A protein has these predicted regions:
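Leu/Val/Ala/Ile-rich N-terminal alpha-helices, chiefly Sec-type signal peptides and the beginnings
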Residues: 1-23, 27
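Short small/polar-residue motifs
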Residues: 13-20, 35-40, 100-112
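Amphipathic, interaction-prone secondary-structure segments
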Residues: 22-45, 112-122
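Short aromatic-glycine-(Arg/Gly/Cys) micro-motifs in beta-strand/loop hairpins
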Residues: 34-62, 175
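Short amphipathic beta-strand/extended segments with alternating polar/hydrophobic composition
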Residues: 40-44, 61-69, 121-136
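Acidic, aromatic-enriched beta-alpha/helix-loop junctions
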Residues: 57-71, 142-143, 147
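Surface-exposed beta-loop interaction hotspot
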Residues: 67-123
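Intrinsically disordered, low-complexity, charge-dense segments enriched in Lys/Arg
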Residues: 98-175
């Protein structure tokens, strides 16, 4: 959970958001207050790490993305909130792929009949388990499979995204 302290420090310092890491104090969530009653949450619910936007002070059960892996959920949170950070730093638009047809070669997105995405399987036997309400939350996870949330956050803070993200300079953000 050390990454959440790093994330909170970066976002608090550079964005004007108020990020509170409750996990650090034994609570089960991280809150991102965007002001005017809006924000985002990363929380632990029934063994799943969930992420979603807060709407009128509430979030949907399970969030827009959930996984037993806190690292996967942290990457989704970073990809979702990075537009705020890059804008405040005066950096150009840089977003990772978000559409199912933009998966890297050999990766397959598993979908349920209820239009919920539940896993990504990679060409080398990789299996990422989650529940997502849209492909836009999980496609980037295939591209960023072997990248830590900290490496991802730091790459987003480079003007051109560095070697990790440079290829997507100018792509639209996840929103």
């Amino acid at each position: 959970m050390a990454f959440l302290d790093e994330y909170a420090a970066v976002m608090n310092r550079h964005t004007g958001l108020k990020v509170y890491n409750g996990f650090r104090r034994g609570h089960t969530g991280l809150s991102i207050d965007a002001g005017f009653g809006s924000g985002m949450l990363l929380w632990l619910e029934d063994g799943q790490y969930c992420f979603d936007e807060e709407e009128r002070g509430k979030v949907r059960k399970g969030g827009c993305f959930s996984s037993p892996s806190v690292e996967l959920t942290q990457k989704v949170m970073v990809n979702y909130t990075v537009s705020i950070l890059r804008h405040r730093l005066g950096l150009p638009v840089l977003g990772v792929p978000t559409k199912a047809d933009e998966l890297p070669s050999g990766w397959v997105l598993q979908e349920t009949p209820t239009w919920r995405f539940v896993a990504l399987d990679g060409p080398q036997g990789e299996h990422l388990e989650f529940a997502a309400s849209g492909a836009r939350y999980c496609v980037a996870l295939a591209w960023l499979y072997d990248v830590s949330p900290s490496e991802l956050l730091n790459a987003y803070m480079l003007p051109d995204g560095g070697p990790l993200l440079r290829q997507w300079l100018g792509y639209p953000y996840l929103r």
